[in-house]
């Protein structure tokens, strides 16, 4: 899952990822 998560992060903007990370955390 870690590898897939990293790939998705690269694909999407970091701004949007920050929000996703918030939910994940």
UniProtKB/Swiss-Prot annotation:
GO BP, sorted A to Z: defense response to fungus; killing of cells of another organism
Positions of the region Disordered? 1-25
According to the record, the segments passing through the membrane are none
Which positions form S-S bridges?
A: none
Out of the domains of life, which is the source? Answer: Eukaryota
Keywords tagged on the record: Antimicrobial, Fungicide, Plant defense
Query: Basic and acidic residues bias: where?
Result: 14-25
Tissue occurrence:
Expressed in seed (at protein level). Not detected in pulp, stems and leaves.
What family does the database annotate? Belongs to the 2S seed storage albumins family.
Q: State its role.
A: Has strong antifungal activity against T.harzianum, F.oxysporum and A.fumigatus with IC(50) values of 32 ug/ml, 34 ug/ml and 40 ug/ml, restectively. Lacks antifungal activity against R.solani, P.brasiliensis and C.albicans.
Protein's UniProt name: Antifungal protein 1
Organism phylogeny: Eukaryota, Viridiplantae, Streptophyta, Embryophyta, Tracheophyta
């Amino acid at each position: 899952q870690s590898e897939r998560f990293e790939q998705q992060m690269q694909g999407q903007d970091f701004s949007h990822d920050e929000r996703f990370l918030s939910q994940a955390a």
